[in-house]
Amino acid sequence: MTNIGKTHPLLKIINSSFVDLPAPSSLSSWWNFGSLLGVCLGVQILTGLFLAMHYTSDTATAFNSVTHICRDVNYGWLLRYLHANGASMFFICLYLHVGRGLYYGSYTYSETWNIGILLLFAVMATAFMGYVLPWGQMSFWGATVITNLLSAIPYIGTELVQWIWGGFSVDKATLTRFFAFHFLLPFIVAALVMVHLLFLHETGSNNPTGIPSDSDMIPFHPYYTIKDILGFLIMLTALSTLVLFSPDLLGDPDNYIPANPLNTPPHIKPEWYFLFAYAILRSIPNKLGGVLALVMSILILAIVPILHMSKQRSMMFRPLSQCLFWLLVAILFTLTWIGGQPVEHPYIIIGQTASILYFLIILIFMPATSLMENYLLKW
């Protein structure tokens, strides 16, 4: 009898994607983050769905509805903190996943890479809009500051901001539409994930060496399914520990104060996972220049495949490029720290130096080092 998994139209797709998929035998734990992101998305959609059953997107009741969820709904506090900290886990996995792609040269699969960048923007937009929904002080002022950046766009900027706000300030209309889009976007993200996987399965996975592994493949199941499940357990343990022991560790205390348009918090800042981009934005004195730098800090990933000058795909055998890569990681940590600090000396100059180095390393130092390594190969 023929295996139904190989004949049924739907099961056939699942079988070829998760069971009989040929995978390189040398994949390290850095290849776990794709599946971990899938779990994160699942957790966020499920917890978000149950939160949406009790949340009201009205400026008069939004803050109280979140309080009601935490106090009166059965395990509402758990849902709320799983959702809030699940977003942090999502971004940790996202940044590690992108870092893996940069280190091992996975960006040479340009379609998969570009869909990935699109996914990154979609998840960032979703997270930003989600942060506005509890309608605390940082929700309101964060929304005001970030949406106001669009006014830097020449000619249409002011009209565009008022169109997004649905009025002359962040108010009821803004909150309602942000809730609508925050609900919708994760499903668009899920669809994009399918496209991301479709393109990945066209080429097959990369591996740590960057060398084609067609002659050394193993079935995805049971080898990598077991490996992924171990990853799930580790991540869910970390998430549970964060949620149950210090749920507010990564949040902002100002968000426990209801939104007040007449009272500005002393330091307006986004969630920790946007701080590096926020630091780059603040390091440029010109508004339009800052906005362009902010967008380019992520969009620069799209030109990384063009800047790949090395004869080797992976950085595994390129110690000079490795040094630059880890310097880039250190700079991103520095920018994250600076983004959470007030705009005063010495933080301003540290942020500006780190921002310049961030772009210099990606645009100039890494390609130049790759060319030098190519030359050294001839020795």
UniProtKB/Swiss-Prot annotation:
Q: Which domain of life is it from?
A: Eukaryota
**Transmembrane domains' residue ranges:** 33-53, 77-98, 113-133, 178-198, 226-246, 288-308, 320-340, 347-367
Q: What does this protein do?
A: Component of the ubiquinol-cytochrome c reductase complex (complex III or cytochrome b-c1 complex) that is part of the mitochondrial respiratory chain. The b-c1 complex mediates electron transfer from ubiquinol to cytochrome c. Contributes to the generation of a proton gradient across the mitochondrial membrane that is then used for ATP synthesis.
Kindly provide the name given to this protein in its UniProt entry: Cytochrome b
Q: Which GO terms describe its cellular component?
A: mitochondrial inner membrane; respiratory chain complex III
Residues binding heme b b562: 83, 182
Question: What membrane topology does the annotation report for this chain?
Answer: Multi-pass membrane protein
Q: What Pfam families does the entry give?
A: Cytochrom_B_C, Cytochrome_B
Q: Which PANTHER family match?
A: CYTOCHROME B (PTHR19271:SF16)
